[in-house]
């Protein structure tokens, strides 16, 4: 009997040893408490994320550490861990944890080991939104912010549920060309456009896998179309027709001013390659950045009075306007509504983007100009289309430039470009919005090793947009089409 009792005691002791070694965190004598939140990069403390987003991996701002131990546990259950030079969570475990805690929160405990000491910081929370983000990923343009030369410009896409990035079309495939203004139809990449500047330039229109290059410049319109936006029915594309110029500052804190000597708005019928024009959108004023309403009945755009640019660049004040559009007849209305008057308020309103549920209109506000990515004071604002009331999105803005933005398919998430980190490089941030218009703290697009990635990848990210599925574009076919110089010409309806 004593023998069995001894065996039992030894078994219990063995189990306790195993638990101590593998199941319980060690508590060294030199464990200290910082009494503060950890200084992490990116700053994910208090952000709201969708379930199934890529893991919120993070680094300590101070690189002088030996190891970081992180435990993440959910308010509705589940726990995952990471040990290493930075917080690097397993993707499958992370997705399971976020799904389990949809509508709840995940609490992070961070311990840092350095020079034989271990410091534990105060816990912080990340909230998991009840709103899904079902889109597959993001598309965006990557460009060196050097201005004088194009460099390796490219249109890329990113699976937001993992860390995988794919090139759609880059300058290495089609040398010497500048790609811009890529636009999917309400996040659906079965309808997508892309503009190419330079020799042999044109507009690529892809519908259900068929690629067509169109020359949108005519004797009447003076220039090719750009800044495009699809009509929700998928047959029309609104575009601006303009000339783009740059001026550089010396001896000031400003670097560049982008301006247009002329700018008008048109609509292309992609079925017939006909341009639909209106005398109300081809005036001496500069009309720019068109965007259709969620139901396609209105076309929003910005308009500024002509002035002598670049000398009078500070006088460029854009108003936010709209005009009716009849998709069945392919006709514009006869009245322009001015929603926000730039000269009266001494502000500039550009880049209007209506949510796909018809509730909100997001736009940029700055003190001048029609190219907000170059304005340090550019901020995001939100108009309630039910009431017409507008407010600044203080929850999302910073003391640096916020500019290009777009909505997720369900209109509960938006992505935008921001220079908040250093005032020079635009990076992509995501935030949620609820039914009352409350916006969450934005979070930087996750990367596997974020500090290494963002410090070494010296690109600016702009023109972000969501896509519900992966963009399928044949780059080899695009190369052939670019250099065969065959373009379908448009005509005026």
Question: Which residues fall in each region the model found?
Answer:
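Positively charged n-region of N-terminal signal peptides that target proteins for export
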Residues: 1-5
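Bacterial Sec-dependent signal peptides at the C-terminal "C-region" and cleavage site
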Residues: 8-32
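Sequence signature of WD/YWTD-type beta-propeller architectures
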Residues: 24-493
């Amino acid at each position: 009997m004593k023998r069995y009792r001894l065996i039992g005691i030894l078994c219990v002791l063995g189990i306790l040893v195993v638990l101590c070694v593998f199941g319980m965190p060690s508590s060294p004598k030199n464990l200290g408490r910082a009494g503060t939140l950890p200084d992490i990069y990116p700053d994910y403390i208090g952000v709201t994320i969708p379930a199934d987003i890529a893991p919120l991996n993070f680094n300590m701002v101070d690189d002088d550490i030996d190891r970081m131990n992180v435990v993440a546990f959910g308010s509705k259950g589940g726990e995952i861990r990471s040990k290493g030079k930075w917080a690097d969570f397993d993707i499958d475990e992370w997705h399971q944890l976020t799904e389990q805690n949809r509508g709840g929160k995940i609490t992070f405990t961070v311990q840092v080991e350095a020079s034989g000491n271990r410091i534990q910081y105060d816990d912080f929370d990340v909230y998991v939104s009840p709103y899904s983000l079902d889109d597959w990923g993001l598309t965006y343009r990557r460009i060196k912010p050097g201005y004088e030369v194009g460099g390796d410009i490219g249109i890329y896409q990113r699976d937001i549920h993992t860390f995988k990035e794919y090139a759609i079309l880059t300058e290495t495939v089609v040398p010497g060309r500048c790609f811009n203004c890529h636009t999917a139809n309400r996040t659906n990449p079965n309808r997508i456009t892309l503009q190419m500047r330079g020799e042999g330039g044109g507009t690529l229109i892809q519908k259900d896998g068929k690629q067509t290059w169109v020359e949108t410049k005519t004797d009447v319109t003076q220039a090719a179309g750009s800044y495009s936006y699809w009509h929700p029915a998928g047959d029309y594309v609104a575009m601006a027709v303009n000339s783009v110029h740059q001026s550089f500052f010396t001896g000031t804190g400003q670097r560049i001013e982008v301006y247009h000597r002329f700018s008008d708005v048109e609509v292309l019928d992609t079925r017939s390659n006909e341009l639909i024009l209106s005398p109300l959108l081809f005036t001496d004023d500069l009309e720019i950045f068109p965007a259709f309403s969620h139901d396609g009945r209105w076309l929003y755009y910005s308009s500024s009075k002509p002035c002598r640019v670049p000398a009078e660049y500070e006088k460029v004040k854009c108003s936010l306007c709209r005009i009716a559009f009849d998709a069945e007849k392919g006709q514009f209305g006869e009245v322009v509504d001015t929603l926000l008057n730039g000269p009266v308020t001494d502000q500039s309103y550009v880049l209007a983007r209506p949510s796909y549920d018809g509730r909100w209109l997001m736009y940029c506000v700055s003190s001048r100009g029609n190219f907000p990515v170059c304005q340090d004071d550019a901020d995001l604002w939100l108009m309630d289309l039910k009431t017409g009331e507008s407010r600044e999105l203080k929850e999302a803005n910073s003391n640096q430039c916020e500019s290009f933005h777009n909505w997720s398919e369900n209109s509960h998430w938006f992505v935008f470009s921001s220079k908040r980190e250093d005032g020079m490089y635009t990076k992509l941030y995501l935030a949620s919005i609820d039914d009352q218009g409350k916006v969450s703290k934005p979070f930087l697009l996750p990367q596997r090793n974020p500090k290494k990635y963002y410090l070494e990848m010296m690109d600016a990210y702009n023109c972000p947009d969501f896509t519900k599925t992966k963009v399928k574009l044949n780059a080899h076919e695009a190369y052939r089409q670019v250099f065969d110089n065959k373009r379908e010409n448009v005509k005026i309806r």
